[in-house]
């Protein structure tokens, strides 16, 4: 039984989507990636090869017209009425991680997080998951903005994950 419908922003080749769709409960798939967005045509081509059932957008999240995505989410909600919608965002992080000395290399890419609110307001996801480096939380009062954007129906809850996938250490 599908319990979660994922929208994967910044989808890349599909590693996160593969993990999402591999989730099982009592041997049954519980999550399905229904749509993906990335500005890079090569990333979308790779993701589409790995996840052909998802709706793919070769678009910048800052400029994507959400009408088609909204319509697709509504169809998916009707197909899986008990499922919760999850907005997953793996925002660009390489220019902010300690791997590059912790110094900001591209301040404009920080604005990508601000564009999530447009998706939150339009899609009204049940859950929002943001994956990024710990320095992400030093950019400003993002946690407060997320709670405010959820109109009091959500909560900011950082997860500290010790190992994911190939033994990567994440927080």
Ranges and model annotations:
Residues 1-171:
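Conserved active-site and SAM-binding loop architecture
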């Amino acid at each position: 039984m599908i319990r979660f419908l994922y929208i994967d922003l910044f989808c890349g080749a599909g590693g996160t989507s593969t993990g999402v769709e591999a989730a099982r409960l009592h041997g049954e798939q519980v999550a399905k990636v229904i749509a993906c967005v990335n500005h890079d045509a090569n990333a979308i081509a790779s993701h589409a090869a790995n996840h052909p059932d998802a709706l793919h957008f070769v678009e910048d999240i800052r400029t994507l017209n959400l009408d088609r995505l909204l319509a697709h989410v509504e169809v998916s909600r009707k197909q899986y009425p008990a499922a919760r919608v999850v907005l997953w965002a793996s925002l660009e992080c390489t220019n902010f991680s300690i791997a590059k000395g912790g110094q900001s290399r591209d301040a404009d890419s920080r604005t990508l997080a601000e564009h999530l609110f447009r998706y939150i307001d339009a899609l009204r996801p049940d859950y929002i998951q943001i994956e990024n480096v710990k320095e992400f939380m030093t950019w400003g009062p993002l946690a407060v903005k997320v709670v405010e954007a959820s109109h009091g129906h959500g909560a900011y809850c950082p997860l500290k994950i010790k190992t994911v996938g190939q033994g990567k250490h994440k927080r």
